[in-house]
Amino acid sequence: MSQTNPKVGIVSLGCSKALVDSERILTKLRAEGYDISGSYDGADVVIVNTCGFLDSARAESLEAIGEALAENGKVIVTGCMGGDEKAIRSAHPSVLAVSGPHQYQAVVEAVHAAIPPLHDPKLSLVPPEGLHLTPHHYAYLKISEGCNNSCSFCIIPDIRGPLMSRPAADVLGEAERLAEAGVRELLVISQDTSAYGLDLRHAESTWRGRPVRAHLTDLASALGELGIWIRLHYVYPYPHVDEIIPLMAEGKILPYLDIPFQHASPNVLKAMRRPANQEKVLGRIRSWRETCPDLTLRSTFIVGFPGETEEDFDSLLGWLEEAQLDRVGCFKYEDVKGAPANAFADQVDEDVKEERHQRFMEAARQIADERGAAKEGTRIEVIIDEVDEEGAIGRSKADSPEVDGAVFMNGETDLEPGDLVIVEVEAAEDYDLWGDVVERLPPPRPRR
């Protein structure tokens, strides 16, 4: 009787960058003959890819490790919290191995030790685009690791190291393989997307027979040749971001920018060790919208940062009203083990954080309501994410998966995930839209 391939399960916690790490680990293991299990009891060993950014995330990671141990018994730990092996083994001494973020080979070797592969590697087991944990029609494209910033509330540089960009040809080759495999949307991610290529001194590499610089503008322009949706995340407002907006106006990449502004008060931004000229940023936002009227701006903010006064918070609300951001997320400040901000004076009370968070999100909701109402009666392009007996759910060019709004098409049951359609918007509420399909679009075609 032939033996069955060993099976590996994975629990992936945290951000989209960690999800890409999980995909790369699974791709390596699949190439060596391992099968992937979607359940604890079906796996011979379970990998837990942890998050270690916030204290609450560390607690969630420890809880997930404990659950995996209870349900399976054989657990390998990796990811951002993996750098603190002492804390992990103190809570869970029976884990098989612990490694830090993007240490793919260490994880593979730990799996080998727990349950060896049955045969030599066979790359034919893996599709050219690798294995992905997202739906088939979209994928994350990680262009760099690490970060060179020194924000006082963050320990990412300590966890993931300094900026390490991938050569442009490497990124574009992966993107091309994904597009050829049927991916309709690529979400470009990193810790600091605008800094892409700085560590490489923007060196050129060859793609499609021509040189392409490791620079965000050049990369975005080249990605636009694939003919699919290209969405930029984690874009810091460096001056050269102005060069990206015309590409959006031309339709090469989606008119969408995810920029983590974090705050607007100069005092708070200085304490955060972030750029503090938000008045200048307002001027740039106006200029961007003049160049690309359809531009969607998403951002995240932190309220209750140590030393944040009521005046600072009011400044943030005023700036938000002027900026008229389309999509907004907000976090209540919490300590991060090892971050300088932990030791700052004038920590804000939890009830004050909660009250400010509610006020901020209400202000953001009112802006979203007004901007959403302006879309009623218009026609927008939508990518389909889900279809069931009640209808279809998709996203517009203004909506990224998981974090933004959705477009609901009641009664549209003959669509499939990944389809592109034109929807006439009938109603809007908060970040969501409702409407009817008026046209089906053909599959995208690469631009050669």
Curated annotation (Swiss-Prot):
Organism: Paramagnetospirillum magneticum (strain ATCC 700264 / AMB-1)
Protein name as annotated: Ribosomal protein uS12 methylthiotransferase RimO
Matching InterPro entries: Elp3/MiaA/NifB-like_rSAM, Methylthiotransferase, Methylthiotransferase_CS, Methylthiotransferase_N, Methylthiotransferase_N_sf, NA-bd_OB-fold, Ribosomal_uS12_MeSTrfase_RimO, rSAM
Binding site for [4Fe-4S] cluster 2: 147, 151, 154
Lineage of the organism: Bacteria, Pseudomonadati, Pseudomonadota, Alphaproteobacteria, Rhodospirillales
Similarity comment: family membership: Belongs to the methylthiotransferase family. RimO subfamily.
Gene3D superfamilies xref list: Methylthiotransferase, N-terminal domain, Nucleic acid-binding proteins, tm_1862 like domain
Main location: cytoplasm
Pfam families noted in UniProt: Radical_SAM, TRAM_2, UPF0004
Function recorded in the entry: Catalyzes the methylthiolation of an aspartic acid residue of ribosomal protein uS12.
NCBIfam families tied to this protein: 30S ribosomal protein S12 methylthiotransferase RimO, MiaB/RimO family radical SAM methylthiotransferase
Cofactor note: Binds 2 [4Fe-4S] clusters. One cluster is coordinated with 3 cysteines and an exchangeable S-adenosyl-L-methionine.
